[in-house]
Amino acid sequence: MAKTDIARRVYNHAWKLDPIVRSLLDTDFYKLLMLQMIWGLYPKVDATFSLINRTTSVRLADEIDEGELRAQLDHARTLRFSKKEMIWLAGNSFYGRKQIFQPEFLNWLHDFQLPEYDLRRKDGQYELHFHGPWSHTTMWEIPALAIINELRSRAAMKNLGPFSLDVLYARAKAKMWSKVERLRQLPGLKISDFGTRRRHSFLWQRWCVEALKEGIGDAFTGTSNVLLAMDTDLEALGTNAHELPMVLAALAKNDEELRSAPYRVLQDWNRYYGGNLLIVLPDAFGTAAFLRNAPDWVADWTGFRPDSAPPIEGGERIIEWWKSRGKDPREKLLIFSDALDVDTIEETYRHFEGRVRMSFGWGTNLTNDFAGCAPKEIEGLNAISLVCKVTDANGHPAVKLSDNPQKATGDPKEVARYLKFFGNEERVEQLVRV
């Protein structure tokens, strides 16, 4: 892959529009896996996705020009999957499986276009919503977040000259490489890039992926970014996300359907994929409730991704549950992915070493850690906690509780109803930075 002078590219403002998202493959792999299942099983379900800025002190509408945001969103809507991309999706092996994507699905995907968006300003923030069929709106999540985060980075750097930009990126590269050198000291480490949605920029994410590939070799297992996986000959990684149980819960007609929603998702998933993709995401409505009500067959799955509890606490809870179901944790897999940086990776690795198989999905602190890198402090370069979540399904409000109350989303009355139904035990309040 040709090298790019990122600082020079940032400084060059000659073009009218420098597209942030240039391919529909510039997304997380699990969006495509989920999309195929949504297309196959829930074609008549409508779902709204909405931007949520959890860092409320940052007024996005004051930092990002509305015209530039609309131009980037409009450009993303012009994209289609290319012939090369379709051939790669059809012919490549993913998770050891050939033709993981059905020919009928790929025929449908060939003409896919991102749906229209609804954008307005309110109290210094952007209200951004995507309405329509679930099989269309789900694909806005990653590009919308990538666009807003990169526009914020560009706005923060717009007054920096070539020399200051050189210093900024030189320091960021040195900071990133020092993390790589620490990761080298962890034998048997398995780590992947999960940093697309809140990255500093596409070019920076690509550099970070190349640095990991060069610096830690086989310990770097791949990237969630499908375009980068294709371009750099890496494994495309990812399983499923909270939106699946959130939508099924929103559609529930009674208490039994609500209670069983997280497990019906897993049954659907097993029908479509199975094998190495049998990873449980347990925290949509609280991990404690999930484990308490889980059918025995859940313990047969490959592993869990504890996504919102502190990693050591969350991992220990799942290990104890496996033991209670007669399973040997050393044969199971834990994938840690919540707000990780090198300190928490080292601590978690050393805590669980030899007790369970581990993998780490490194996100925002991999692809957007510029704190202290500019010649003078620039607040706009600090990563924020920005998400794009499903907020209703067929007109019914969607809710996520999480193991961290700070990450709960949904109408407050519905959140209270879900808490009463699923329980509030073992949820731990933590500051959300990214």
Curated annotation (Swiss-Prot):
It holds the Pfam family NAPRTase_N. Transiently phosphorylated on a His residue during the reaction cycle. Phosphorylation strongly increases the affinity for substrates and increases the rate of nicotinate D-ribonucleotide production. Dephosphorylation regenerates the low-affinity form of the enzyme, leading to product release. GO terms for cellular component: cytosol. Keywords: Ligase, Phosphoprotein, Pyridine nucleotide biosynthesis. Pathway: Cofactor biosynthesis; NAD(+) biosynthesis; nicotinate D-ribonucleotide from nicotinate: step 1/1. It comes from the Bacteria. One of its GO terms (molecular function) is nicotinate phosphoribosyltransferase activity. Transmembrane segments: none annotated. Its EC number is 6.3.4.21. It catalyses: nicotinate + 5-phospho-alpha-D-ribose 1-diphosphate + ATP + H2O = nicotinate beta-D-ribonucleotide + ADP + phosphate + diphosphate. One of its GO terms (biological process) is NAD biosynthetic process via the salvage pathway. The keyword Acyltransferase does not apply. The modification Phosphohistidine is found at residue 242. Catalyzes the synthesis of beta-nicotinate D-ribonucleotide from nicotinate and 5-phospho-D-ribose 1-phosphate at the expense of ATP. HAMAP family: NAPRTase. Belongs to the NAPRTase family. This is Nicotinate phosphoribosyltransferase. It comes from Brucella anthropi (strain ATCC 49188 / DSM 6882 / CCUG 24695 / JCM 21032 / LMG 3331 / NBRC 15819 / NCTC 12168 / Alc 37) (Ochrobactrum anthropi).
